[in-house]
Amino acid sequence: FLMIRRPPRSTPKPSSAASDVYKRQHKMYGPTGLGILYGKKKWLEELPPYQGGGGMIKEVKKDRITYGDLPNKYEAGTMATAQVIAFDQSIKFLENIGIENIIKHEKELIEYGQEVLRKNNSVKIIGNPKNKGGVLSFTIEGVHPHDIATILDEDGVAIRAGHHCCQILHDKLEIPASARASVGVYNTKEDFDQLNESINKCKKIFDLKWI
């Protein structure tokens, strides 16, 4: 059994290798608390439900439980009605902009961001894949990423700091953590200019004159 998390812009369809795929709504400009589980029927019927509640059973006896048909088996309790309605709107939002337009916009921003940060000799960009996604991870020698994130937050620049769900990779790179800037449809090149200015502020606060 193999479950794969698909990126927001991909088509959620199980392959011959994957039994199930899932996507999260908040990765698609929607609210939190809802996602998609798209799987092969034989596995969804065989797997036990992850939680119990009203509406997901056919019959309860002292010695056995008969679960409801799919998808009711996995939809216990009150449905997240507001999130479902919002999910529809977030899909329409993405379709109106166009996935290809979003990819093009993010690629241009990341390329610009790399160009800007490469000129800052205190910044080390992590990774440089040919087809880089909408994220840019970096470190500043002498400054912990959590401190970077806190200082940038004071300037209204929101980034993520930590392991980003890949601690093994950070161990391989021999770094305790990293800072990560992510881009979306609402970001501009000016955001990376501000990021660079705030990074220079970090250098001053930590008195990194040698950098």
Task: Label each residue range with its predicted role.
Residues 1-18, 22:
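Single conserved hydrophobic/aromatic residue that forms the stacking wall/gate
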Residues 16-211:
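Pyridoxal 5′-phosphate
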